[in-house]
Amino acid sequence: TASAHRDFYKEHFPRFSDRRYRSLMEFFSLPDNKPLRSFSLGQKNQFEVIMALSQGADYILIDEAFAGNDIFNREDFYKVLSGILEDNETVILSTHLIEEVSSFISRAVLIREGSITGDIKTEEIENSGKTLTSYIKEKYNYRGDRVSKALDDITGEAE
């Protein structure tokens, strides 16, 4: 059950925040007494994030935090995340949902094929007049004509 996991974390993480755990469980309407195997994929992801944010770590790694959740839950999560972090807490968020996170991240580190291809503070991007998406496209050498060329090849209209 969720409460059994909470008890395990409380025992092994001295800085575990029961208050944060309970508040987030209530916010996401997750049952404390149901077996985790009965949770939907979205609920399991929410629960994993709740546990990560409640353990009291200075650095919290969250990988594709809300895969399987609708846009409303994801937006709510981002707002809650921005509001609950203490000054000593840093979240490292891995995501492909760039537009959703661009408004509240302070730094973007781009990793491609195991190597860092970009590392920039979002303030620098804003000052340059670019968006995070345009910065990423530039760093990844994205070809803007990629789709039209593929469609020409598929439909045979380029011949």
Language-model regions: role of each:
Residues V101-S103:
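A short, surface-exposed alpha-helical micro-motif characterized by mixed small hydrophobic
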Residues T1-F47:
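ABC-family P-loop ATPase nucleotide-binding domains
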Residues T95-H96:
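H-loop/switch region of ABC-family ATPase nucleotide-binding domains
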Residues I71-N73:
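Helix N-cap at the start of a conserved alpha-helix in ABC-type nucleotide-binding domains
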Residues E64-A65:
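Walker B catalytic motif
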Residues T122-E159:
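ABC ATPase nucleotide-binding domains
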